[in-house]
Amino acid sequence: EGGSIHVDGDGTLMTTEQCLLHPNRNPELDQEEIEQLLREHLNVHNIIWLGEGLMDDETDGHVDNLACFIKPGAVMALISSDPEDENYNVLQDNLLRLKHAKDARERSLEIITVEQPEARWKEDERLAQSYINFYLPNKGIVMPAFNDPVHDNQAREIFEKVFPDREIIQLDAQEIVMGGGGIHCITQQQPKAFVIS
């Protein structure tokens, strides 16, 4: 369940209350106990809690649809500029939490925002589409597209500015999202080797 947490590699972890505090996942643990386990097992010092996930997200609010570290001290976050959108309040709340958050080095976060794509539906459920759900391989970026030329292009331009030294590949992710996930969800990152000298 790699999308339930995101780490910066420098002691800070980000997750959501909806996901890790959900009774389906951790029925016997409260927030303090979960934080203790994350600190012990992942060697993190600071935990940033976002609130809820996207509307109809089958993952119970995985953070990899909402925000991700792009480097220590910097986060990319999904937003909606439409107050009538069902995700607007959730995304505004998460953005506010990020604005007040500090990383493990007590720095305020640099926040790069990306507008969510146009809403799409599968029967009566909204698809949890997010440009934040991308994969970061060596020297590259595999990011989603949603057959929404305006937002797809805007997102790509932001990624090109944020990651100028990486080759960016934008893939149509609509079928992946219909299955209940995104590009980040169907990949598994290989951590950088830690060598003890």
Explain the meaning of each model-derived region.
Residues E1-S197:
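The feature marks the mature, well-folded catalytic cores of soluble enzymes
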